[in-house]
């Protein structure tokens, strides 16, 4: 996707390109921190917050745009995918008991995951055919993000536990995706000849939906973590009595 080659941008964008670069670095760093923190927390807690269905969609998105439509700077996508392999392993190994308590289900979970990746890759390719690669890159990425945010919030409420998750994981993914959205709207303003498509009601709705879902997630996580900490303190007091 040559559209992401910012060296070809008009002069008015070049003057403020450093701001776009900062947002891109923050985006890349945020999600790398999220991935590494997810792997570390999963092995510490023997649980993983990452829902498998959104993860398969995200992996398909990375595969499609790494192999078929690589943007300039695509090594970061490749690095994301490499680290994501650790997230995949963690999510499959420490899948919630409801998804892995049956031996047959647990045995075929990796196969089902691969099939899901193939299905989502088909969807991303269809989106590219309808919208062209550049818009599909962002709309597909936001679809993955909203699935992740909604499923993570649902899992947090359903399990009533913060095991497998952390403030670092939540905050880093919020910072990463917020930087991606800020960069997108920034380019739509300063480079409208190529990026005006991003300044529309649907993209603003996607941004708002992400903010609401992950905002509610943060509040619910704080409430559960506070309750868990209080239970730990109460248990310690009972042991000393």
Swiss-Prot record:
Q: Where in the cell is it found?
A: Membrane
- Which one GO biological process term can you cite for this protein? terpenoid biosynthetic process
The answer to whether UniProt assigns keyword Transmembrane helix to this entry is yes
Gene designation: olcD
* Alphabetical list of InterPro entries matching this protein: PaxB-like
Q: Which EC number(s) are documented for this chain?
A: 4.2.3.-
Q: Please identify the protein, giving its name as recorded.
A: Terpene cyclase olcD
Q: Does the keyword Transmembrane helix apply?
A: yes
Q: Identify the enzyme class.
A: lyase
What topology in the membrane does the UniProt record assign? Multi-pass membrane protein
